[in-house]
Every structure is written in C-alpha cells, then in structure tokens.
Amino acid sequence: MQFIQEKAIGSWVEMDTVIGTPGGKVILTVDFTFCNFMAAFLLDSKACANVSNVFAGIKRKFRENDMRFGDIIPLILTDNGNEFSDVNAIELDLDGAKETSVFFCRPMRPSDKPHVEKNHTLFRDICPKGTSFDNFTQDDVNLIFSHVNSIVRNSLGGKSPYDLFSFTYGKKQLPCLASKRYRAGKLAKVHYC
C-alpha cells in the first residue's frame, strides 16, 4: 500500500484464475477495483506462458488503438501462483520498458484481493463450481463476463461496472477487453454452464 500512496495510484487491478475442472481450461480474470469491471481470458491451462501470451495480446490491442497499457493498468495485485511467475511479461511493454507493477498477496489470503474474489461469486452464479471450461471459447467467456459487467450494483450507485469503466476511460478501451453492455432484462443463465 505504501507504493500506491507514493505513486498516487487511484486504482489498480486484482488478478486471479478461476479453475474449471482439474487439469482443464482455466479463466484468467482481471478486476478493475474502482468499479469491479472484470476482463476475462480463457487459457488452455495455468501455464505461465498462457498468461504471458494474454498480456502480450492486450498490450498489442492497446497500442493499435493508440493507448498505453500502463495508463489503464498501473498496478496489478495477484497471488503467487506459478501462472504469474513471469513478472517481466506482465510488467514490461512490447519494447521492454516497465509499464506496470505487479505485487503479490500474502500466501493463503484471498482477502488481500477482495474485489476479484467477489466478482468470482457472480461468475459462479452463472457457471457453478465444477463446471468444465473445456468446451468454452473466448467468445463464450466474453459473453459471460459481459453479463457480469452489466449487472447494476447498489455499491456503484445504481450503475454497472461497464457503465463506470466506459465513463472513466471511454468506450475506446472496451474492445481491447472484449466487453459489451447488456440491459438488465437481457441477463440470463448461459446455457452451457
């Protein structure tokens, strides 16, 4: 927290993975704490290279849209799982300059990243624990998390995470994070969960 105060960082992201079935596909989740907007990426496994590839792809998309990754994601808080062990792949931009900072939670302390853990419960309302992600596509994951991001929340003053994220950063960033807005009446249980 000292780093956050010293650098005057107003917002950071919490990162985690959601397990489907043991040995199967997993979902990498990135939660923007100020509004609980969550980006999610389907991975073939918890291998570190898969996480590195996702971050390289996000950074490319931001650059193609004349945006700087570190302006949107200045700090990442995550656990010390092996999938997050290539810190350089996460922290450095495509040219090798440091663009963000990664910090690790204390072992066995999910309370250190409460926002991402809370949003996982909303995901589990759609896809209960034990659901296999092996037949999911990235489009399926985008749809599910677009639904999660469209839920209006009292804690956000009657707004959705999508609304606050797009108000803060503009809608230009949303395609980089593969999210769409759904009206509350259109939220429905996804058929494959």
Please provide the spans of the model-predicted regions.
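Active-site beta-loop-alpha junctions of metal-dependent nucleic acid enzymes
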Residues: G20-G23, A40-D66
